[in-house]
């Protein structure tokens, strides 16, 4: 009944009906070997078990719901919200309101940098990296109109959908036979247009049902834009032409001719009858879509204009363009001249995007994988002010001989290679970037009191192993610095937990016993005010 595999007193003997399980030896001398063998097996099984992993989730429903309740109660004036409520303590993360609550519409002191609440919406925190199993260069990304998913178009001609809250994969489909270069949702969110390297433009319904295909250009389609009422759309391509199409029948109506090289980007003004285009001939041109005539040509760039975009909100009278001469220029449509020049001393710029909520926030991306954020409030006059005249003594408008401004925040190692796409979430609380490193990366607003923020790999370029899975990736996304010097005055007794019983903010000026006072580490007292009215946000310059 037993079969012995060696002469060691039935050690390693097994029962034919025991499914291979080793029986405990009867000889006491073999007990030690048996126990050691069993422990070795258990250790091997334990090492094979998957470690518990935490997935980051961005739930905008909480702060959006709180804000709507406050609006219904008439508490919409949040001009002092950042100073009075958001404090440098990690538990205050849930008190961050939607981006709209910090916009100029609800901030009475927008022109005062000390109370500029737009800094709270700078996307400085790396959240997640998404990539397909079979990786390809990503040329463009778009958030779906409702903001629940991110649509990624790759060089393989595939559409990939990623969840916008949990960032997990949802579906993939073959959309084009050649690399997809551009996508655009209609203003009324009913249609999606995509263009590929063969010059084909495809119509898509929200459920990704392809209903029409047109051959738009002889070469690749570089950009697509809808008219304000969605009755027409434009395309530009490598054949140096800009074409206006009737959306309903897919017929070409006009061709805008004037560029002498590939047209890299084009946009249709959201309110005005105005089209802008940027080309490889270093020129930015403004067009009248009705007459197909060029109304103005903007000079100043010394290399290819990669991207040009109208200001989508606010006064909607500004134009941002980036070029391979390492500069981004902000043009005023009333004077047809550049008001500001943003320069990157390290590499050429590839993308530019306006924040969907904050009209004065601009984000640029570069070929070295860096991302820079700019706030233009202090440099641009209000809509009721006159157009500034150039003066060498007017430093507030940056119209001096240098005519440049610095980034208020920069992520130097956001990607490993060139960035091809920068897209804001419709609510403004998330930013997605993608590029030649074949990944799509998500960025969110900074966490209050995150001492390890500067030690993320996107700031230190520490890429040991799977670096993007270990970037400050604990449950609360906030870690204490192990090398930080502890302040005895900030230490709280074990029986005086500020997060217990009476709430998570009881430690300010009070203690559990009701007599002695204590303070939560990193939490300012209510009577203490910042020196300059600003709070520590990773990568943010002080005002």
Curated annotation (Swiss-Prot):
WD repeats lie at residues 133-172, 175-215, 216-255, 258-297, 300-341, 344-384, 414-453. Residues 1-31, 486-543 are annotated as: Disordered. Residues 1-12 have a biased composition (Low complexity). Its main location: nucleus. PROSITE patterns: WD_REPEATS_2, WD_REPEATS_REGION. It comes from the Eukaryota. One of its GO terms (cellular component) is chromatin. Gene3D superfamilies: YVTN repeat-like/Quinoprotein amine dehydrogenase. Keywords: Chromosome partition, mRNA processing, Nucleus, Repeat, WD repeat. It holds the Pfam family WD40. It is found in: Nucleus. The keyword Hydrolase does not apply. GO terms for biological process: chromosome segregation; co-transcriptional mRNA 3'-end processing, cleavage and polyadenylation pathway. Required for 3'-end cleavage and polyadenylation of pre-mRNAs. Also involved in chromosome segregation where it has a role in chromosome attachment to the mitotic spindle. This is Polyadenylation factor subunit 2. It comes from Candida albicans (strain SC5314 / ATCC MYA-2876) (Yeast).
């Amino acid at each position: 009944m037993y079969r012995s595999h060696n002469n060691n007193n039935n050690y390693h003997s097994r029962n034919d009906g025991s499914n291979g399980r080793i029986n405990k030896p009867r000889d006491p001398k073999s007990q030690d070997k048996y126990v050691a063998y069993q422990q070795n097996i258990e250790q091997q099984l334990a090492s094979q078990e998957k470690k518990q992993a935490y997935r980051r989730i961005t739930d905008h429903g909480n702060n959006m719901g709180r804000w709507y309740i406050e609006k219904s109660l008439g508490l919409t004036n949040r001009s002092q919200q950042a100073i009075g409520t958001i404090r440098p303590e990690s538990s205050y993360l849930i008190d961050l309101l939607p981006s709209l609550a910090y916009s100029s519409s609800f901030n009475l002191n927008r022109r005062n940098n000390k109370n500029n609440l737009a800094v709270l919406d700078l996307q400085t925190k790396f959240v997640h990296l998404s990539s397909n199993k079979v990786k390809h260069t990503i040329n463009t990304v778009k958030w779906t109109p409702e903001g629940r998913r991110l649509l990624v178009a790759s060089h393989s001609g595939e559409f990939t959908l990623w969840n916008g809250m949990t960032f997990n994969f949802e579906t993939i489909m073959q959309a084009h036979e050649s690399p997809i270069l551009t996508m655009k949702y209609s203003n009324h969110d009913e249609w999606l247009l995509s263009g590929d390297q063969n010059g084909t433009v495809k119509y898509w319904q929200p459920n990704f049902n392809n209903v029409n295909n047109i051959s738009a250009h002889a070469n690749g389609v570089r950009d697509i834009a809808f008219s304000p009422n969605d009755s027409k759309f434009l395309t530009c391509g490598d054949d140096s032409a800009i074409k206006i199409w009737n959306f309903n029948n897919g017929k070409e109506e006009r061709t805008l001719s004037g560029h002498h090289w590939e047209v890299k980007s084009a946009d249709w003004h959201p309110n005005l009858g105005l089209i802008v285009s940027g080309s490889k001939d270093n020129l930015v041109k403004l067009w009248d879509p009705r007459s197909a005539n060029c109304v103005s040509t903007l000079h100043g760039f010394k290399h290819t204009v990669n991207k040009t975009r109208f200001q989508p909100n606010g006064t909607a009278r500004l134009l941002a363009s980036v070029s391979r001469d390492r500069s981004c220029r902000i043009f005023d449509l009333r004077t047809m001249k550049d008001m500001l020049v943003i320069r990157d001393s390290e590499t050429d710029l590839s993308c530019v995007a306006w924040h969907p909520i904050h009209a004065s926030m601009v984000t640029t991306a570069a070929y070295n994988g860096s991302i820079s954020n700019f706030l233009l409030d202090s440099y641009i006059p209000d809509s009721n002010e006159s157009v500034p005249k150039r003066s060498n003594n007017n430093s507030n408008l940056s119209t001096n001989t240098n005519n440049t401004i610095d980034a208020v925040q920069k992520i130097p190692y956001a990607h490993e290679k060139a960035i091809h796409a920068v897209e804001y979430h419709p609510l403004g609380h998330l930013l997605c970037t993608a590029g030649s490193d074949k990944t799509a990366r998500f960025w969110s607003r900074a966490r209050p009191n995150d001492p390890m923020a500067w030690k993320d790999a996107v700031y230190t370029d520490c890429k040991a192993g799977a670096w993007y899975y270990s970037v400050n990736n604990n449950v609360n996304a906030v870690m204490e610095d192990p090398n930080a010097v502890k302040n005895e005055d900030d230490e709280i007794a074990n029986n005086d937990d500020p997060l217990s019983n009476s709430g998570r903010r009881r430690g300010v000026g009070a203690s559990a016993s009701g007599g002695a006072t204590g303070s939560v580490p990193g939490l300012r007292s209510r009577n203490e005010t910042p020196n300059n009215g600003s709070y520590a946000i990773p990568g943010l310059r002080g005002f």
